[in-house]
């Protein structure tokens, strides 16, 4: 609900009490945005819901409310329509005043959270000794956008990268490298990430078929857990090599994270099992220690347990996740803990959340949220793969997007007979390519699968990053052409006369509502939809209204609308992790 809607809601609530008495305090006036401009800007539907309770016709109830309703500073006189709708149309003078106010506000009228909280956002989380692939794309950019929005709202956000840096895979890899390439375990940078991945695959194949090697690998895990100096040194080298490769991608995507991998929680795992045992939740089942859960059954309908300690005494993901959750509550003091992973892990989160609640580890004021997302599909509608059927490397995907953007820009420059430096072309291609990939993902409802298409995401028309970057650049083109410094435009300059000015003005004032919605529901696509609609409304205004050639005071007013649109686009896109360009 935006600031204007909030004001109207308060006035309607007061009118309800004035008309029908204190018993109606707190009744929701059911105020919604009008579905059609002919009904005004907002519509209150409360009269219809009260008809039975009051024993009156809805139109009579609406009339009684309107008689007590004081919205003269905000709206034209309210109108009663149909069976009893109260239609409210915002005054032009009110819109002008609101825009003049936000012109001087760096936050563009978006209030910070009234009660800032400490929030953890767990996202990206690649595995050591494996390359980041297209599956990491969604978690990384959705998590980053959520973190940016929460930070903008004033929350204390800890961005956590729960990397897979512990477990059996390291025993396999270290054991294999001791045989075939021991220098990799003692020398920094002996391997690049491609070599590491190749060796990991060979180690896995060997582990799956060679029982003697399995035992050797397990012994390496035992040595690692015991802190044996040579094994620990080898592990650190392998982690550091992967970490450097991850950082290349994070810098390309402008992602900031605090790494706190699985190994961080290793000392806490035995305590998790002990405490679950003390609380009476643990049951031994076929040698493993488990917690049986409500609402989870296997195919035979039998209760499904969550294993927290395997029959061989080892721990698993669930144990680590329980340890990390308890640490985030007790040590980080987080009040909302958000996990951004694929939808396929939904059951896992529901299970270990339930165990933590049963154990009494979740205070009433702590909220746990799993933010699930769908798959990235190829244009054939199947899971996105390379032509050879391999998983697409994230580095390759991003490089290809920049390459496509570079080729598109070169073609456009030739058509326009424009000369630009290679430095300009490379920078624009980088920004457009990376932005296109991010926006194509974020503009989808995260719970849905989406089809990955370079051609669609780089299109200058439609709901794409290039379209909005172009609108932003167009506005700065106006300032260059007119030699205008937007920062020096006068205050109280907005005068709304044309219908496209009014439509743009109303939309500019909805930013606070959109950001508040994303803050609560963690759906960045709502911000994308808003920015796309805003861009369209600006283009309609641009096509219908003269700007630089207009007479004063209309000229300055329209330049203020240009400035507010550009600032809103820049702010909104920055919350999606997207950089803007003043020239394209």
From Swiss-Prot:
Family annotation (PROSITE patterns): AA_TRNA_LIGASE_I
Biological process terms in GO annotation: arginyl-tRNA aminoacylation
Domain of life: Bacteria
Keywords annotated in UniProt: Aminoacyl-tRNA synthetase, ATP-binding, Cytoplasm, Ligase, Nucleotide-binding, Protein biosynthesis
The family this protein is said to belong to: Belongs to the class-I aminoacyl-tRNA synthetase family.
PANTHER family xrefs: ARGININE--TRNA LIGASE, CYTOPLASMIC, ARGINYL-TRNA SYNTHETASE
NCBIfam families, sorted: argS
Protein name according to UniProt: Arginine--tRNA ligase
Species whose genome carries this gene: Nostoc punctiforme (strain ATCC 29133 / PCC 73102)
Name of the encoding gene: argS
């Amino acid at each position: 609900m935006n600031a204007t809607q909030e004001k109207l809601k308060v006035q309607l609530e007061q009118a309800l009490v004035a008309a029908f008495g204190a018993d109606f305090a707190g009744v929701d006036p059911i105020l919604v945005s009008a579905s059609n401009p002919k009904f005004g800007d907002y519509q209150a539907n409360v009269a219809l819901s009260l008809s039975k309770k009051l024993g009156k016709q809805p139109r009579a109830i609406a009339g009684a409310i309107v008689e007590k309703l004081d919205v003269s500073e905000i709206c034209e006189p309210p109108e009663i329509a149909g069976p009893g709708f109260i239609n409210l149309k915002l005054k032009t003078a009110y819109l002008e005043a609101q825009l003049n106010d936000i012109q001087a506000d760096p936050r563009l009228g978006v209030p910070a959270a009234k009660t800032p909280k400490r929030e953890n956002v767990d996202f990206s989380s690649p595995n050591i000794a494996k390359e980041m692939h297209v599956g990491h794309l969604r978690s990384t950019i959705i998590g980053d956008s959520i973190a940016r929005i929460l930070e903008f709202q004033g929350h204390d956000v800890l961005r956590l990268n729960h990397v897979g840096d512990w477990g059996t895979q390291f025993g396999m890899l270290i054991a294999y490298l001791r045989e075939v390439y021991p220098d990799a375990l003692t020398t920094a940078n002996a391997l690049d990430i491609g070599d590491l991945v190749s060796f990991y695959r060979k180690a896995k194949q060997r582990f799956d078929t060679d029982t003697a090697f399995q035992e050797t690998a397990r012994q390496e895990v035992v040595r690692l857990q015991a802190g044996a100096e040579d094994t620990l040194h080898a592990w650190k080298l392998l982690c550091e090599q992967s970490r450097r490769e991850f950082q290349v991608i994070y810098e390309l995507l402008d992602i900031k994270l605090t790494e706190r991998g699985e190994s961080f929680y290793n000392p806490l795992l035995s305590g998790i099992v002990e405490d679950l045992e003390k609380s009476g939740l643990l049951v031994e089942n076929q040698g493993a220690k488990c917690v049986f859960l409500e609402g989870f059954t296997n195919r035979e309908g039998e209760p499904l347990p969550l294993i927290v300690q395997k029959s061989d005494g080892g721990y698993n993901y669930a144990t680590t996740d329980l340890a990390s959750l308890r640490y985030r509550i007790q040590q980080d003091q987080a009040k909302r803990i958000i996990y951004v992973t694929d939808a396929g892990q939904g059951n896992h989160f529901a299970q270990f959340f339930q165990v933590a609640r049963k154990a009494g580890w979740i205070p009433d004021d702590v909220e746990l949220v799993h933010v699930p997302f769908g798959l990235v599909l190829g244009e054939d509608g199947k899971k996105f793969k390379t032509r050879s059927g391999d998983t697409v490397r994230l580095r390759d995907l991003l490089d290809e997007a920049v390459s496509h953007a570079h080729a598109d820009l070169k073609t456009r420059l030739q058509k326009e007979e424009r000369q630009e430096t290679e430095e300009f072309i490379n920078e624009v291609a980088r920004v457009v390519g990376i932005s296109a990939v991010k926006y194509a993902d974020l503009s989808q409802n995260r719970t849905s699968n989406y089809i990955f298409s370079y051609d669609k995401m780089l299109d200058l028309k439609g709901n794409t990053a290039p379209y909005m970057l172009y609108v932003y650049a167009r506005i700065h083109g106006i300032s260059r052409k007119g030699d205008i410094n937007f920062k020096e435009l006068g205050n109280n300059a907005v005068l709304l006369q044309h219908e496209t000015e009014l439509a743009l003005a109303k939309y500019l004032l909805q930013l606070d509502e959109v950001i508040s919605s994303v803050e609560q529901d963690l759906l960045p696509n709502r911000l994308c939809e808003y920015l796309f609609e805003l861009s369209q409304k600006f283009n309609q205004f641009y096509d219908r209204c003269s700007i630089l050639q207009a007479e004063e005071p209309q000229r300055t007013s329209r330049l203020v609308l240009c400035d507010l649109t550009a600032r809103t686009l820049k702010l909104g896109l920055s919350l999606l992790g997207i950089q803007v360009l003043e020239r394209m």
